[in-house]
């Protein structure tokens, strides 16, 4: 096999490979001889089938197998010999001339093909011990825990039918029918809907107009759907709702004790408080980690500038762009609504894709040099978590992952990345800073800009006045 480099520009490589017809013939002769000893053909004794007869019957199919084996093995062997790592699977380019292909299969012509690929750039890991980040820390007060406990426990609160007008925190049972320009709209009606006034369960302006109504009252209310509403056909529109109040119920006193905790599946009130505190700590911890991780990535972004494989960037950009357009479509928005143009958005997200690829390569190199590995247990846990996300389809998802190496690699990658971040955190300068929960949860402008408009679209409310109905309508948008 003759290997010749025909292109070496930046990360791009093109390798011409020539497998002489004589080499192909030698491989075919070896395969025919092996088959001769095993072949069972009518009219011939076992092991006595003439090679010429086997060649006539199986020569082309055997040669096709040989060619495929060469193609499958050549990429790996050539890259290994050249001490190169391909960013993606090398592209194989062969002659499309059918006559030429027939000559190769007949053993009368050399097999010639080319491998096109981009190599992974050589990255020299720099000293990262001088990277300094600030880790924001929030002290969780007992008052915050108690407030959250009350919010959770409110689901166990009972209500008692009352006479008189509905007040804030009362529960009303209503029938409603929504109309646009006097015509009912899909998803805008329900019977025996229960709503706790002041809960924010319905769209803004809806609940307030029910205060003061009594059982048996009927009223037509007018609301305006938010301009950034999830359903485009309702966004910014004025609608009316025919309301019939069927019951008004006042809340009984909310008692926080062990019995209330048990109704929530927790053995005691003290354990409930502990669980809630752990949940709050976890939520704040995730936000803190994301902010610290961004600081690390920004520092690495400044330290490492190199050419990135364009096919990797293309793939990353396509993933981002697909999600952006999906989110915009779901929200009924356009690039103009987001105060940009498609061209400008493409340029912005192309830069983001390049940054992600470059930082991914840097983290990969740092992790490899540090000996970071994803254990089988960690990978199995990720597989289990992924399967669990699809109730009723567990077997299908598991089988898909088992037979799709790329899907498993996609599960491995984020685990590896987080372990590399852990390695960096253990070796850089980290300064803790006490902040309020408002400061911690304040949206970072740079992070938000990366998500725009996907982040904005995802934050929109769905269609219909009730959250349950909103979820159903979101699938149509």
Curated annotation (Swiss-Prot):
Q: Which family does it belong to?
A: Belongs to the FKBP-type PPIase family. Tig subfamily.
Q: What is its EC number?
A: 5.2.1.8
List the GO biological process terms: 'de novo' cotranslational protein folding; cell division; chaperone-mediated protein folding; protein transport; protein unfolding
Question: In what ranges is there compositional bias, type Basic and acidic residues?
Answer: 467-477
Know the name of this protein? Trigger factor
Give the comment on domains: Consists of 3 domains; the N-terminus binds the ribosome, the middle domain has PPIase activity, while the C-terminus has intrinsic chaperone activity on its own.
Species this protein is from = Brucella melitensis biotype 1 (strain ATCC 23456 / CCUG 17765 / NCTC 10094 / 16M)
Chief location bin: cytoplasm
